[in-house]
């Protein structure tokens, strides 16, 4: 009976689920093109990382970058499906999947650095911590009642900036250029949040998702420089 009640709770749309995301057809198309561009670039970027990881790194690098790329593509895919679906009975499930995938993308973005650059307990502890937070976030997003977008945006931002806790191992093991790219990407994501929580902004979703694609692109470059090509840049870190 509890399972049936939970299923009904998860699948029942609320008033916000039945509101169209876009005020005009132009806004809808703009957001679609942003998603198409993001998904295309993420897919190509994932292949590039896989090839270069196989050339310059070992199996660990290949696996870590594959996790990162898959999480990024998963987030963009769920976002595309959810945002472009008209109000319908499936909307609440798609929304939950879209928002849950953000936690996976953030954890996936940490993974190449925590597993391939960090050492000792920092590598183990921080990797376990970010994935524990991610899985907890996914579980909550999939079953919990709706909470305001502003609240969850704050949670995502805090999770993304959790890296400051590991500032010392990052400074010790990550190339300065990659560090700069990580910070820049974080700032882009954070700036985009202010657009997302401002419903009066025209083309809000397209602009917000544009920030997401831009931030993801910068972080892709950070993974390339700081993890995949790190063996060729090792002297610069020392």
Annotate the PLM regions.
Residues 2-238:
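Multi-pass alpha-helical transmembrane bundles in non-GPCR membrane proteins
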């Amino acid at each position: 009976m509890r399972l049936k009640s939970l299923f009904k709770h998860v699948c029942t749309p609320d008033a916000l689920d039945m509101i169209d995301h876009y005020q005009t057809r132009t806004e809808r198309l703009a957001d679609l093109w942003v998603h198409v561009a993001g998904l295309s670039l993420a897919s190509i970027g994932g292949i590039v990382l896989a090839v270069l990881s196989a050339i310059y790194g070992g199996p660990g690098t290949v696996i870590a970058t594959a996790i990162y790329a898959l999480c990024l593509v998963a987030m963009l895919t769920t976002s595309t499906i959810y945002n472009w679906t008209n109000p319908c009975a499936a909307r609440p499930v798609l929304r939950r999947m879209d928002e849950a995938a953000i936690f996976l993308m953030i954890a996936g973005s940490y993974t190449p650095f925590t597993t391939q650059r960090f050492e000792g307990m920092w590598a183990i502890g921080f990797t376990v911590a970010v994935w524990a937070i991610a899985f907890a976030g996914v579980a909550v997003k999939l079953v919990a009642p709706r909470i305001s977008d502003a609240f969850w945006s704050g949670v995502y931002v805090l999770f993304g900036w959790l890296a400051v806790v590991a500032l010392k191992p990052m400074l010790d093991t990550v190339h300065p250029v990659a560090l700069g790219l990580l910070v820049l990407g974080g700032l882009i994501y954070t700036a985009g949040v202010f657009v997302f929580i401002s419903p009066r902004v025209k083309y809000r979703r397209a602009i917000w998702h544009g920030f997401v694609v831009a931030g993801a692109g910068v972080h892709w470059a950070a993974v390339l420089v700081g993890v995949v090509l790190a063996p060729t840049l090792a002297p610069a870190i020392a």
